[in-house]
Amino acid sequence: MDFESKKIWRYGDDVDTDVIIPARYLAIADWNELAEYAMEDIDTTFAPNVKAGEIMVAGKNFGCGSSREHAPGVIKAKGVPVIIAHSFARIFFRNAINIGLPVIEIGEQVDRIDAGDAIGVDLSKGIVYNLTKNEQYQGTELPQFIQDIAAAGGLVNFAKNRK
């Protein structure tokens, strides 16, 4: 498994980028500082309590709304290593990959994951393991080049390393 977390952060459908990081904070240039406001408009407990390595799980169309790399950036800055969702808004999906935050879509199976479940992820196989329920969910496998971009820490690092 690439990632394993005993605690997850569970969110519903249509969580938009304006909720992930409200526009009123976008003047803050440092992503670690900006991350202190992550999810503030939907979950005031997230930013002060999330621990590095804890996984985020969401419903349909996660990251819809404005095209801003700040949204996946603040989630990554808080130490979330991967986001699992029913589906992602396409621009959020690409922005997440471009900054080195892996995302995996598992469709309706996401409804089997409850807030208290321990979760594991094997990115290369596109599998999410529900360690609490002893179940596994086949997600969309990411093409190898996308896995390589995420592993490099994002598109910029990937391009630098290809020299």
Which role does the model predict for each range below?
Residues 1-23, 156-163:
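N-terminal, positively charged, Ser/Thr/Ala/Gly-biased leader segments
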Residues 3, 55, 143-145:
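Short hydrophobic "helix-edge" motifs at membrane interfaces and signal-peptide entry regions
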Residues 15, 63-69, 150-160:
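Conserved phosphate/anionic-ligand binding catalytic regions in large, soluble enzymes, centered on
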Residues 19, 33, 37, 95, ...:
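Alpha-helical scaffold segments in soluble metabolic enzymes
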Residues 21-125:
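Feature captures the catalytic cores and cofactor-binding loops of soluble hydro-lyases/lyases
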Residues 99-163:
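Acidic, glycine-rich flexible loop/linker segments
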